[in-house]
Amino acid sequence: MVKIKYFGILKPCMPQTEDDGYWHAEKAGVTIGQVLEETEVVGKVENMVILVNKVRKPTDYVLQAGDTMTVMPLVAGG
């Protein structure tokens, strides 16, 4: 089981959430990129920060059981 949470404008892309605000998904063995494609996050924002267990990871990282994945869009101002 992997806990996944999207923030900001990406939050509506989460298929479901539990009471703790996370999507609990059977995604062990799947890459971050595959999760993003499945939930149609790809193309929603140009840049995002992806953390797994509070450490930044690339989209080819393979998720493990017990991981917590957090996805946040980068915000710019001027």
Language-model features, listed with the residues they occupy:
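Ubiquitin-like/PB1-type beta-grasp interaction modules and other compact soluble beta-rich domains
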Residues: 1-77
